[in-house]
């Protein structure tokens, strides 16, 4: 059973996150291992396994990138373990330039510049995310997979910038 079916949701990117949360809570209560403490060893093991599956499904579907990766995996794209990378040289050059800029900001400890950088990267991420949503909605799986690969780069860059922000705030 796929994760969408487990949560009673259609297998598509745009989901009702409130319904996801409510169903997660219901499933947690229903399959919590403590409810099977007096059961047989097989029942206890099954409850632990089911609970682990529910938690993994929840973690996967609640985050935009992992939800997209999972949806793509249902259509034959195993992005989690693939060796493919982005082949768009202009995008890769842009990423190198942004990384260098972030390094410069780190060296200068310029929090104002960092704030502007974070906003710019977030806008880039949001634009790619919208592009990916449209591609997934239109079943453009190859294009969506490529966009997810690019979103990974931007997500890591955003995370690095946010870590630098925490570092500068503690400084």
UniProtKB/Swiss-Prot annotation:
Sorted UniProt keywords: Chaperone
Pfam families named in the record: HSCB_C (PF07743)
Entry GO terms, CC: iron-sulfur cluster transfer complex
GO molecular function, one term: ATPase activator activity
UniProt cross-references to CDD domains, sorted A to Z: DnaJ
Swiss-Prot/TrEMBL GO biological process terms: [2Fe-2S] cluster assembly; protein complex oligomerization; protein folding
Domain of life from the UniProt record: Bacteria
Job of this protein: Co-chaperone involved in the maturation of iron-sulfur cluster-containing proteins. Seems to help targeting proteins to be folded toward HscA.
PANTHER family from the UniProt entry: IRON-SULFUR CLUSTER CO-CHAPERONE PROTEIN HSCB
Protein name: Co-chaperone protein HscB
Organism: Salmonella agona (strain SL483)
Lineage: Bacteria, Pseudomonadati, Pseudomonadota, Gammaproteobacteria, Enterobacterales
């Amino acid at each position: 059973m796929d994760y969408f079916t487990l949560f009673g949701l259609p297998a598509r990117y745009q989901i009702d996150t409130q319904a996801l949360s409510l169903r997660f809570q219901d499933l947690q209560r229903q399959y919590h291992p403590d409810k099977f403490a007096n059961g047989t060893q097989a029942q206890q093991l099954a409850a632990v396994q089911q609970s682990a599956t529910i938690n993994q499904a929840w973690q996967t579907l609640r985050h935009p990138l992992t939800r997209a990766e999972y949806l793509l995996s249902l259509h034959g794209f195993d992005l989690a373990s693939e060796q493919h990378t982005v082949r768009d040289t202009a995008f890769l050059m842009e990423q190198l330039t942004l990384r260098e800029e972030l390094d410069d900001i780190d060296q200068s400890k310029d929090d104002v510049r960092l704030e502007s950088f974070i906003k710019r990267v977030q806008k880039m991420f949001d634009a790619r995310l919208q592009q990916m949503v449209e591609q997934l909605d239109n079943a453009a799986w190859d294009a969506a997979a490529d966009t997810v690969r690019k979103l990974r780069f931007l997500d890591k860059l955003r995370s690095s910038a946010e870590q630098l922000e925490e570092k500068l705030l503690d400084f």
